Regions:
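Bacterial Sec-dependent N-terminal signal peptides
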Residues: 1-19, 331, 395
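Phosphate/pyrophosphate-recognition segments in soluble nucleotide-handling domains
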Residues: 2, 323-335
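Hydrophobic alpha-helical membrane-insertion segments
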Residues: 11, 221-223, 310, 354, ...
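Generic detector of isolated residues embedded in canonical secondary-structure elements
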Residues: 17, 141, 209-210, 299, ...
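N-terminal catalytic or cofactor-binding beta/alpha core of small enzyme domains
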Residues: 19-296, 302-327
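C-terminal outer-membrane/trafficking sorting elements
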Residues: 332-343, 347-408
C-alpha cells in the first residue's frame, strides 16, 4: 500500500507577483546577507504601529496563500513578494520571499516561506547574520534542505542603529562596555517586523517550533553548543535535548550545555530574547523573562569551527533538524500523468478522482491542517465535493491498494 499526494486548486488564479526569479535560493539569500548594512550607519529604524498592522495583514495573506492581496498590502511598506523557483532542487521548489525593494530604506529583514513545506511546523530564525558569522548562510542551507515552513533573517548588523532598545538586558557586543541592546538587534526589540512575524506564525501555526541560530566565541570552559528554551523549565517535548542527541549522531566530539538541564549554567542562555519571551508567554515580552516553557522556542549558540564554518558543519545541523522534525505531510515523487487524474482542476465544487481501489481520501491546506477526510470501500473514480472550502491550494492524499506508482 502506498500513499499518493496530489496538489490541486480550488478555482483561484493569481496575478503576476511583484517579482519572479529562479536559481539557487542559497546563493540568492547569501548575496542579500553579504550586502546588508554593517555595524554602523544607523540604517535601521523601527516600523510604526500602522506599518506593523499592515505587515501583519501581509503575513496573514501569505499564510493563506493570498499572494495578490499580500503584494498589494506590502507595496506601501517598500517591500515586495518575490516568487522564487529553486532549480537546484529536484523537483524544483517554489519559495515566497518577502524582501525589501532596492529603493526602500526599510531594513526590516527578509522572510522566506515554502510554498509546499515538508516540515510545516519548523521555523528557522537568524537575527544576527553579520555578527554571528555564517548563521544566516547556515540558516538558509538548513531551510532549503529541510524544506521548513519559514525562515527569518535580519536586515542589518545587530549594532547598526545608534539608538537603544527599551527592552531589558545588556551586552558588550557593540563596544563601549556593557550597555543596552541596540534597536537593530532584532532578538532584543519588540517593535520589529521580526517580532511581529514571530507572533503571527506562533499564533496561527499551532504546533510551530522556532529554532534560532546564533554563534559565539568559545572560551576554554565552554562547550561547543549552548542551548536553551528560554527558561529553566523542562517542557513536555524537550526539543533541545532531542536536537542535542541528533547532533551527537552527526559529530560525537560535540559538547553541550542546556540551560534547563544544568540550571547553574548562565552564559548565553537567551533569557532576554524577546522572541523567546513571546513564545513562552511572558507577561512582558520586552522586560520580563518567562518562567515556564511552551517548548516551542530553541535558542542555539554554536562555536564556529564545528557547526558554522562551512557547509560541512551546516549539514550536521540540517541533518539533526531533519531527524527531530519529521515530515508533516509525506509527499513522494510520482509521475502524476501515469498515476491518476483530477478534474476539473481548478474546480468550483466537485472533483473527480480517476483512480482505482481508493479506500481513503484526505485533504490538507497549506498549513498542513486536515480539512477533509472520507473513507470508501475500495471504490473506483470517487467524486468529492469542495464547495464548502475556501479558495486556495490543497494537497490531496489518496490511499489505495492498486494505484499505479511511478517513482522518478
Amino acid at each position: 500500500m502506498k500513499n499518493l499526494v496530489l496538489i490541486f486548486l480550488i478555482f483561484v488564479t493569481f496575478s503576476s507577483f511583484s517579482q519572479i526569479s529562479s536559481g539557487n535560493i542559497e546563493n540568492y539569500i547569501a548575496n542579500y546577507i553579504d550586502n546588508v548594512p554593517g555595524n554602523s550607519g544607523n540604517d535601521y529604524a523601527d516600523p510604526n504601529n500602522s506599518q506593523l498592522a499592515t505587515w501583519n495583514t501581509v503575513i496573514d495573506n501569505l499564510l493563506a496563500n493570498n499572494l495578490t492581496n499580500a503584494r498589494n498590502f506590502v507595496n506601501s511598506l517598500g517591500y515586495q513578494v518575490t516568487e522564487f523557483t529553486d532549480t537546484s532542487i529536484s523537483p524544483n521548489q517554489i519559495f515566497y520571499i518577502l524582501e525589501k525593494k532596492t529603493s526602500s530604506s526599510n531594513y526590516w529583514g527578509t522572510y522566506v516561506f515554502s510554498k509546499t513545506p515538508t516540515r510545516n511546523n519548523l521555523i528557522l530564525q537568524a537575527p544576527h547574520i553579520k555578527y554571528d558569522t555564517n548563521t544566516g548562510k547556515q540558516a538558509i542551507f538548513c531551510f532549503k534542505n529541510t524544506l521548513a515552513r519559514a525562515l527569518f533573517i535580519s536586515g542589518t548588523h545587530r549594532c547598526n542603529s545608534s539608538s537603544f532598545s527599551s527592552c531589558s538586558g545588556t551586552t558588550s557586543t557593540c563596544g563601549s562596555g556593557s550597555q543596552s541592546y541596540k534597536k537593530s538587534d532584532l532578538a532584543h526589540n519588540v517593535t520589529t517586523m521580526f517580532q511581529k512575524t514571530t507572533e503571527n506564525l506562533f499564533t496561527n501555526i499551532s504546533n510551530s517550533v522556532f529554532i534560532q541560530l546564533h554563534g559565539f566565541g568559545k572560551k576554554s570552559s565552554d562547550p561547543y553548543v549552548i542551548m536553551s528554551n528560554g527558561t529553566r523549565d523542562t517542557p513536555a517535548t524537550d526539543y533541545a535535548s532531542l536536537i542535542k542527541n541528533k547532533l551527537l549522531n552527526e559529530d560525537s566530539s560535540l559538547t553541550f550545555q542546556i540551560a534547563h538541564i544544568n540550571k547553574s549554567w548562565t552564559r548565553l542562555i537567551g533569557f532576554t530574547n524577546t522572541q523567546g519571551r513571546l513564545i513562552n508567554n511572558s507577561s512582558n515580552h520586552c522586560n520580563t523573562s518567562a518562567s515556564s516553557s511552551t517548548g516551542r522556542f530553541i535558542h542555539i549558540e554554536q562555536e564556529k569551527l564545528k557547526l558554522r564554518n562551512d557547509s560541512n558543519g551546516w549539514t550536521k545541523m540540517s541533518n539533526a533538524l531533519k531527524s527531530v522534525f519529521q515530515s508533516t505531510l509525506s509527499i513522494e515523487k510520482y509521475n502524476l500523468n501515469e498515476v491518476v487524474s483530477v478534474s476539473p482542476n481548478p474546480t468550483f465544487d466537485k472533483v473527480l478522482i480517476s483512480a482505482k481501489d481508493v479506500f481513503q481520501i484526505e485533504v490538507y491546506n497549506l498549513l498542513g491542517q486536515k480539512v477533509f477526510q472520507k473513507k470508501f470501500n475500495k471504490v473506483n473514480n470517487p467524486i468529492i465535493n469542495f464547495i464548502s472550502q475556501s479558495k486556495g491550494i490543497y494537497f490531496l492524499n489518496l490511499r489505495g491498494n492498486s494505484i499505479k506508482l511511478v517513482k522518478n
